Regions:
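Extreme N-terminal leader/targeting segments of oxidoreductases
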Residues: 2-55, 73-80, 579-586
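Glycine-rich Rossmann-fold phosphate-binding loop(s) that bind the pyrophosphate
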Residues: 59-62
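Glycine-rich FAD pyrophosphate-binding loop
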Residues: 72-99
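Conserved FAD-binding subdomain of flavin-dependent enzymes
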Residues: 103-143
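Rossmann-like flavin
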Residues: 131-236, 251
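Helical element adjacent to the flavin cofactor pocket in flavoenzyme catalytic cores
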Residues: 235-326, 331, 357
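C-terminal segments that line or cap access tunnels to active or ligand-binding sites in enzymes
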Residues: 239-251, 324-548, 555-566
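Active-site-proximal substrate-binding core of FAD-dependent oxidoreductases
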Residues: 556-586
């Protein structure tokens, strides 16, 4: 028997080794074929004569900037023939970040990168030079920094008593696990208009688990968010399921994403001759009559920079498009209508218009194939939350947080006060976090999901609070003395708050037809790229979504045959599945 068992094990080992060798051979063949296609495509693009063809990109966020980079790098399109229109005076869209030592610093959002699942992001930025490390790409710079500053949260969840919870267990009951498994196995099309709460209506315990609090605040889900998007997150981020309690999969950047990624990308585009028209809003599109989808003209509204009232400060213009020109539009923005407050001032009560969504709505009203923006931008009470960026003199504030969490700046990922009325979370990055940040100042960032609720200590809704009040609420959840809080508040330069009414709009429940295709059916020269277009299997609210959409738009309109980096199917890899199952059983 022992001899037979030995022979069986030997045969199994040989078969396994043969399988590994075969897989390597197949991978090598795939890479060789991909390299051959790239070489052919490059030769074709090098021989193209674009003449006077122009590319007009609407919106100055990551999607448009990535599209411009792909046009230049992969299509050999002249940078001087590319124009990016941005309605504000800052590029980067939702990836903004800036300020100064006098007024403090601010990031409206804080976007998570992940080494395993940002395939096109890393590929694009591998060709964008770093601004601070000559000879290195942005991708190399970020990943080198991240590997030197690993994340391992020691205080992922904190209860109402200020106790750091043991989150090694996900806290599931059997019914929770069955509902999760059933969701993963359900066809996405059957989840039209369903919320997460709808799906787990028979197991409300799910919303009390450690897993829910951690997954919710990592990705900014609400109970009323789309069940389909929640399902996508589970599939796309299954690699992270097994380590969600430590956030080891979070990829840290040397500075905020604006300074670490947007500024180098902007410099790359400027060096290539791309035109940026800031403070210039595209108010409408003119489509050619008849079948198909062809943009004929863009209607522009430029701020003339003069101190004038109303329409007197704007110049209206029309940009006619010729045969061969292309237009790529940012369809909706998560930070549309964002409002800022500061240490002593709450954000304004008056809502601002959703500029990007308005343009999308006008286009969709004429062409039904352009999706349904109303589905995403009509319920601010469901899609709004607030962030706050704290700037302090010295490191006393950060030391107090470090003493509580056990994490030095840059190592803790996200900390969530799970029982707080506003569901407050914060992250303390490695310092400095802004390019212009002085050595004697420190910053950290936080956000609250339940902004209409009355605070636990400050008895008013977060939406109505000043930066000072929000920080006081936060510090009291650390359960430190009033005397120490007073000392810490003396070091504060500013707390810039940001109300974002549409930030969770991509997670709104919707039908599978509500998001348009990147290049709509019948389009001759028009594409859309944003968090609101349809990218099968991809997860919204990520940098990868914007870059993948941009690459899809450019390659389709320009006839590029080089494959786009696919969504890596971690949810089909046995090792990843087993690790996730093991975590789910804890």
């Amino acid at each position: 028997m022992k001899g037979k068992a030995g022979k069986f094990l030997t045969a199994a080992a040989v078969a396994a080794a043969a399988g590994v060798v075969l897989k390597r051979m197949r991978d090598q063949q795939k890479e060789q074929e991909a390299s051959r296609i790239r070489s052919i495509e490059e030769a074709v693009m090098n021989n193209r004569d674009y003449g006077d063809r122009q590319a007009y990109l609407i919106g100055g966020g990551l999607a448009s900037m990535a599209a411009a980079a792909y046009l230049i790098r992969d299509c050999k399109f002249p940078g001087s023939h590319i124009t990016i229109y941005e309605s504000s005076d800052v590029l980067g869209g939702s990836n903004d970040g800036g300020g100064d030592s006098g007024k403090g610093f601010v990031c409206r959002g804080n976007h998570m990168l992940n080494e395993e699942t940002c395939e096109n992001f890393w590929e694009l930025f591998s060709s964008i030079p770093s601004l601070t490390n000559p000879g290195r790409s942005v991708t190399e710079e970020i990943l080198n920094f991240d590997h030197a500053h690993p994340t391992h949260a020691r205080a992922r969840l904190v209860n109402r008593d200020g106790k750091i919870l043991d989150v090694s267990s996900m806290g599931f009951h059997s019914q929770d696990r069955l509902a999760l498994l059933k969701l993963l196995l359900t066809d996405e099309k059957r989840l039209d208009n369903l919320t997460i709460q709808d799906w787990f209506k028979d197991t409300p315990h799910f919303f009390t688990t450690n897993f829910w609090y951690m997954w919710q605040t990592t990705f900014a889900f609400q109970k009323w968010s789309s069940a389909a998007e929640f399902r996508r997150s589970l599939n796309r981020m299954m690699f992270e399921f097994g380590r969600i309690e430590t956030l080891e999969g979070v990829t840290s950047t040397p500075l905020n994403l604006y300074d670490s990624a947007i500024r180098p990308l902007e410099e790359y585009l400027r060096q290539a001759g791309v035109h940026f028209e800031k403070n210039c809003r595209v108010t409408d599109l003119d489509f050619a009559p008849g079948p198909g989808l062809t943009v004929k003209a863009l209607y522009l509204k430029r701020d003339n920079g003069e101190q004038a009232e109303g329409e007197a400060r704007y110049i209206h213009d029309i940009r006619q498009m010729k045969d061969g020109d292309i237009c790529i539009m940012t369809a909706g923005s998560m930070t549309d209508g964002a409002l800022l407050g500061d240490l002593y001032t709450a954000v304004p009560g008056k809502e601002e218009p959703f500029i990007s969504a308005q343009l999308w709505s006008k286009a969709a009203a004429r062409h039904l194939e352009l999706g349904n923006p109303e589905r995403f931008f009509s319920k601010c009470h469901e899609t709004a939350w607030m962030s706050f960026t704290v700037t302090c003199r010295g490191d006393q504030m950060l030391k107090a947080i470090e003493n509580f969490t056990g994490n030095i700046p840059g190592s803790g990922g996200l900390m969530t006060f799970k029982d707080s009325a506003w569901l407050l979370s914060s992250t303390v990055p490695a310092q400095p976090y802004f390019a212009a940040q002085p050595k004697d100042e420190t910053c950290f960032w936080g956000y609250g999901l339940y902004i209409q609720a009355e605070g636990d200590y400050v008895k008013k809704p977060m939406r109505d609070c000043t930066g000072q009040e929000i920080l006081m609420e936060y510090l009291r959840h650390l359960h430190i003395s009033e005397e120490e809080i007073a000392q810490l508040m003396e070091t504060v330069v500013n707390v810039i708050t940001c109300y974002m009414p549409a930030v969770n709009a991509p997670f709104e429940p919707h039908r599978c037809t509500d998001r348009p295709q990147v290049v709509p059916a019948g389009s001759k020269n028009f594409a859309m790229a944003s968090q609101f277009v349809e990218l099968p299997k991809e997860l919204v609210f990520t940098e990868e979504y914007s870059v993948r959409a941009a690459r899809t738009a450019v390659y389709t309109l320009m006839g590029v045959n080089t494959p786009i980096c696919p969504v890596t199917p971690y949810n089909r890899r046995l090792k990843v599945i087993f690790r996730a199952l093991k975590k789910a059983m804890t």
